[in-house]
Amino acid sequence: MRPAQALIDLDALRHNYRLARQLGGGKALAVVKADAYGHGAVRCAQALEPEADGFAVACIEEALELRQAGVRAPILLLEGFFEHDELALIAEHDLWTVVATPWQVRALAEFRSPRPLRVWLKLDSGMHRLGLSPEDFRAAWLHLRGLPQIDSLVLMTHLAQADELECSRTDEQAVAFALTCGGMRAETSLRNSPGLLGWPALRNDWSRPGLMLYGANPFPQPSELTAQLRPVMTVRSRIISVRDLPAGEPVGYGARFVAERPTRVGVVAMGYADGYPQFAPNGTPVLVDGKVCPLIGRVSMDMLTVDLTEHPHADVGTPVQLWGDAPQVSTLAAQCNVSAYQLLCGLKRVPRHYSTPAHA
């Protein structure tokens, strides 16, 4: 079997959820969209369900996957519904839905639900992606709150630049949210992962931790709080070939690396088809049997190459760690000019192995 694999530490996942809930000071929806950021939504939800207040996914397909796996906790559709007929499925499977556009407000008002629905009304407080304008938000609140098909409303918005700690935009969005929601008696939801880790003064009833659940730092620099996160995913493989090159010889496609000295080259079974960044630069750290070795040459579809010159005992079969506790996924992402989100979600071909039972 090909040695590339992703080890998922469900104890670390639970630890990170507890930290998020503690920082939020209220309830927390664990965001498990995009297959739990590449970690496996079903297994992650099953691991968290005994203590999670609920889950958040992007769409109804992701929610139904969890329901079919036996997850009974509340599930919120972050993008709401895309077609009118999805409302019947939302009611049937007892899902919560975001309402973020005028047409969704109209569709919900026209829907004769067999059971009252819990709705999260979304304000565009400055991100300008999804969300109602302040005027439409207030009108929707007045219209929906008295309808028999509505059980309760939660008021929410989404922070656009909370990962930029020197930016005033987060405070401006929080003020806009508070002003628009003034006088509305309902629970609120504002803070995402960077909001929880970087903006302690913000308060709401429901937080929505995503990236931090998986142990990744949303900020360029670590802090006392981000240091408490535990990486959930460790990506490993093995050396599958070793060769010695004389000075002046190139390595890989495009001869991007040329040996300046006699160089011992190790080939690792991990490539960009597995989710490793294709344009990782020469020198990107790779952990070979616990020792940092530099990446050399262009990353191929199925393989990458490392300089083993300073690691003479490494050989075929030696274990390799691409990210985990070291290098951390956020650090690797920054070095490769991509986001940690991309790396985690892009791990499609690598089999996952879970370190603890889902219901531990």
Curated annotation (Swiss-Prot):
The active site of this protein is located at K33 (proton acceptor), Y253 (proton acceptor)
One GO BP on record is: D-alanine biosynthetic process
Required cofactor(s): pyridoxal 5'-phosphate
UniProt function note:
Catalyzes the interconversion of L-alanine and D-alanine. May also act on other amino acids.
Organism of this sequence: Xanthomonas campestris pv. campestris (strain ATCC 33913 / DSM 3586 / NCPPB 528 / LMG 568 / P 25)
Family that this chain belongs to? Belongs to the alanine racemase family.
| Higher taxonomy | Bacteria, Pseudomonadati, Pseudomonadota, Gammaproteobacteria, Lysobacterales
Presence of keyword Isomerase: yes
User: Per UniProt, what is one GO molecular function of this protein?
Assistant: pyridoxal phosphate binding
Q: What is this protein called?
A: Alanine racemase
Q: Which Pfam families match?
A: Ala_racemase_C, Ala_racemase_N
Checking SUPFAM superfamilies in the record gives:
Alanine racemase C-terminal domain-like, PLP-binding barrel
Reactions catalysed, semicolon-separated, are:
L-alanine = D-alanine
Q: Which residues does this entry mark as bearing N6-(pyridoxal phosphate)lysine?
A: K33
Q: In which pathway does it act?
A: Amino-acid biosynthesis; D-alanine biosynthesis; D-alanine from L-alanine: step 1/1
Q: What is its EC number?
A: 5.1.1.1
